[in-house]
A protein has these predicted regions:
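N-terminal single-pass transmembrane signal-anchor helix
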Residues: 1-37, 41, 48
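Conserved hydrophobic/amphipathic alpha-helical signal-anchor segments
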Residues: 31-74
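Periplasmic/extracellular, small/polar-rich flexible segments of pilin-like filament-forming proteins
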Residues: 57-168
Length: 168
């Protein structure tokens, strides 16, 4: 009679190998999950930038969210919108500048603490005639939050203004 099966040592080796793989893979998995959740931020900011750009060219001024036609992801609420992972907050225009768009984490995402923020300061440069003005931007993020969204800073490449301050 022929016996088939695995020896105890073979099973233990397989269990040890699976344990090592799990120890390496689990932290990476959580990092990837946090980055995928945070990927919503650059997408929402990019939509806002496109709408604000069009409004500035047409109106020669910065516009509020309602004027430019922007609605943050999620359910509209006072001063912005509320999504599952982020609050999106509208800023105030002062002298054609301001931090007019913010995202605030509703939960901890890796090194980005709960209530960590991403912000987008907006200003105007150019002439006073219609179509001569351009919006300029500056991005900022709370400690640990920017690392989750490397594409957030790239949204404004070529249109950065060092004179703007991002108020988080």
């Amino acid at each position: 009679m022929k016996k088939q099966g695995f020896t105890l040592i073979e099973l233990m080796v397989v269990i040890v190998i699976m344990g090592i793989l799990a120890a390496v893979a689990v932290p990476k998995l959580f990092g990837m999950i946090a980055k995928s959740k945070a990927s919503e931020v650059p997408t929402a900011a990019g939509t806002y930038i496109n709408l604000q750009d069009a409004y500035v060219v047409e109106a020669n001024a910065l516009g509020t969210w309602s004027k430019v036609g922007y609605t943050g992801p999620g359910t509209s609420s006072a001063g912005g919108s509320e999504g599952g992972i982020f609050y999106y907050l509208e800023g105030t225009i002062s002298s054609n500048t301001g931090t007019l768009w913010k995202a605030q984490a509703r939960q901890k995402l890796n090194e980005c603490n709960k209530d960590g923020k991403w912000g987008l300061a907006v200003g105007i440069q150019g002439g006073e005639a219609e179509g001569q003005s351009n919006a300029v931007y500056k991005t900022g993020a709370s400690t640990g939050c920017g690392d989750l969204t490397p594409s957030f800073d790239k949204l404004t490449s070529g249109r950065n203004s060092t004179g703007l301050t991002v108020s988080l």
